[in-house]
Amino acid sequence: MRLYQYKGKVKGMQIDLDLKSGSLKTDIKSLKKAARQAIEPELMRRVGMIIKSDELKFAMDHKIYWIDNPIAHIVPGKDYLNPKLKILVDEAINLESKEKLENYLKKWLHDLIKTELFDLVNLINSKSKNNYERGLSFQLFENNGIIKRESVVEIIKNISKEDRVNLRKAGVKIGRYHIFLPKMLKPNAVNLRINLWSAYFQENKETAIPKFGLNFLQNQIKKNQKFLLICGFENFGIFYIRVDILERLFLKIIESTKDRKFKINSDMINLVGCSKENFFKLLELMQYKRKINNENKEEFFVYQPKHKKNKERKIVKKLNKNAPFDKLSELRFR
């Protein structure tokens, strides 16, 4: 838009003024005031358009966009699933319209999180009376829906079959290598989880979510292992494999194992999505030893885990039945 002595346009919900170089400094304040008075009706109109719009987008820079213009951004709240929202609006907007827009965007973001991350949100709303089940839910929440099984082995040992059924109904997978939420590995869920996580912890590292559709990554030795685990990839040397694919591979190995030995087949390799050479290397990193039958020269694998020597083992204290996870009760998605 063009007004007397300046040019300007509205981007999203903010005015971008371009004052002429000939304007006196003493005039700038009055010019801005005049511009904002002229543009107030347009801002009110846009609030109505945004509320009726289906063009909102929550981008990976932690901002909410409307028609390619940022209108709000998130900042850390009480936890990563409950961020605070700050709207990006010009001061020309009246208080009623501002509050109307803010309340709408808060609800929009809340509904987005609740819908896309239902299983994760459900963890912190757990009402289980079993401390071990609640403890596992808390650990999953703390680690964005994915944890290594070895880190909670004592908790797992104390979860009954009935409690495991409850966890399974809640979307929790207790696997051979990881405890995770399978639905949280879907593209929309991964993007949203990472977006909220990085905003809460204010992670500024250059990290990119692996391309969706890939089950296997290689030559990633310098990558952030913790970040990739949150994205759903476990590390083995220079390789990364999706945690759900890793579990499926383990099941295929179990199905093919006889007398503690198994042969690889094309289904296993195709599942992982790598070359045969890399598959052999991956199995070795997973502590499977390749051997050859002296009689028929057939190749097979056996599981031979390496035992840690002279290393202090981390002991996980058992949970007191009368000491519930008080912190978990503080984490409620509102």
Can you name each region flagged by the protein language model?
Residues I315-R334:
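Short linear clamp-binding motif
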